[in-house]
Swiss-Prot record:
Domain KH: 125-193
One of the GO biological process terms: rRNA processing
GO cellular component, one term: nucleolus
Known partners and oligomeric status: Monomer. Component of the ribosomal small subunit (SSU) processome.
Xref: Pfam families: KH_KRR1_1st, KH_KRR1_2nd
The protein, known as: KRR1 small subunit processome component homolog
Family matches, as CDD domains: KH-I_KRR1_rpt1 (cd22393), KH-I_KRR1_rpt2 (cd22394)
Coiled coil: 270-302
SMART domains: KH
Any GO MF annotation of the entry: RNA binding
Protein task: Required for 40S ribosome biogenesis. Involved in nucleolar processing of pre-18S ribosomal RNA and ribosome assembly. Binds to RNA. Required for female germline development, cell viability during eye development and for survival of dividing cells and epithelial cells during early wing disk development.
Family: Belongs to the KRR1 family.
Length: 343
């Protein structure tokens, strides 16, 4: 082993401070001089409305993949795109990158952006958001939050993550560096889980400023990040009739009395069939008699005459008679008192 090779191994085994800042080592034709053993191919379908655009840009697609010794085919009858390796292909992973490129193009990503995925330090992520929200109205509202007014929110996400983001249908297609793809996925998933994207955008902006200060490299940044509390806490619906809680007892509840037990207590258990039937008939007739009595009382209420009040003339005469009566004793006492005063 030469000195240069030993130096490279030493460098690779040293601890890394920031793994995201590391440059991905390039894969060269010298690393795989024998090429591929077998041909590999990937195909993807595209919607009808993309047919016209793909037909226009397909010569550029063929030219782009030919640089990496790949072949591209467009089938307008079946509505599919195919990428294949050739005998000259030396990069084993380039076919995966080409597959991602045609997937992005099928999802309305323009060719100028999709071809960037063929670079080593660029990746793509297709985030499925259709099954994250059950109600369609909520889904449309939260997806619109991700785009923002005039696409302002989406543009700010792109600037902070250095990724190209396209929201369409039930998916979000992201294209950019791997660190940015992680951030985009977090923002998208949290937005669909009813966390407004502005909170995550604000946190990313603060982190970007903190990264500029080398003194804070080994410190916890959570004290600088904003903490948002959910104000819309859904309260549990209270029942209309609340049952009073019974006092706790360590003993099990008493066993309910069975039908046989009730019959034994009343003595009905020892009666024969005819006696039981006679008792039931007696109870039934007693109930019928009681019901008939109540019915008669209710019917006879209409025939009871109302109580007549005394007429006004009678009242007046009785009042006059009461006033005409003179208390003789009181009058005598009054006269005697007056005579004494005179004397």
């Amino acid at each position: 082993m030469s000195d240069s090779e030993t130096e490279e191994t030493k460098i690779s085994t040293e601890p890394v401070e920031n793994a995201w800042a590391m440059k991905i080592p390039s894969f060269k034709p010298e690393d795989n001089p024998h090429g591929m053993v077998e041909e590999s191919s990937f195909a993807t379908l595209f919607p009808k409305y993309r047919e016209r655009y793909l037909k226009e840009v397909w010569p550029l697609v063929e030219q782009c993949v030919a640089e990496h010794h790949l072949k591209a085919e467009l089938d307008l009858v079946e509505g599919s795109m195919v990428v294949k390796t050739s005998r000259k292909t030396w990069d084993p992973y380039i076919i995966i990158k080409a597959r991602d490129m045609i997937k992005l193009m099928a999802r309305s990503v323009p060719f100028e952006q999709a071809k960037r995925v063929l670079q080593d330090d660029i990746g793509c992520d297709i985030i499925k958001i259709g099954n994250l929200v059950h109600k369609k109205e909520k889904f449309v509202k939260r997806r619109q939050r991700l785009i923002g007014p005039n696409g302002a929110t989406l543009k700010s996400i792109e600037l902070l993550t250095d990724c190209y983001v396209l929201v369409q249908g039930n998916t979000v297609a992201a294209l950019g560096p791997y660190k940015g793809l992680q951030q985009v996925r977090d923002i998208v998933v949290e937005t669909m889980n009813n966390v407004h994207p502005i909170y995550n955008i604000k946190a990313l902006m603060i982190k970007r400023e903190l990264m500029k200060d080398p003194r804070l490299a080994n410190e916890d940044w959570s004290r600088f990040l904003p903490k948002f509390k959910n104000k819309n806490i859904s309260k549990r619906k209270q029942p209309k009739v609340k049952k009073a809680k019974k006092e706790y007892t360590p003993f099990p509840p008493a066993q309910p009395e069975s039908k046989v037990g009730k019959q034994l207590a009343s003595g009905e258990y020892f009666l024969n069939k005819e006696q039981k039937q006679a008792k039931r008939q007696q109870e039934r007739s007693a109930k019928q008699a009681d019901a008939a009595k109540r019915q008669d009382e209710r019917r006879n209420k209409d025939f009871v005459p109302p109580t007549e009040e005394a007429s006004s003339s009678r009242k007046r005469s009785s009042a006059e008679n009461a006033s005409s009566k003179v208390d003789v004793k009181a009058l005598k006492a009054k006269l005697l008192k007056a005579n004494k005063k005179k004397v």
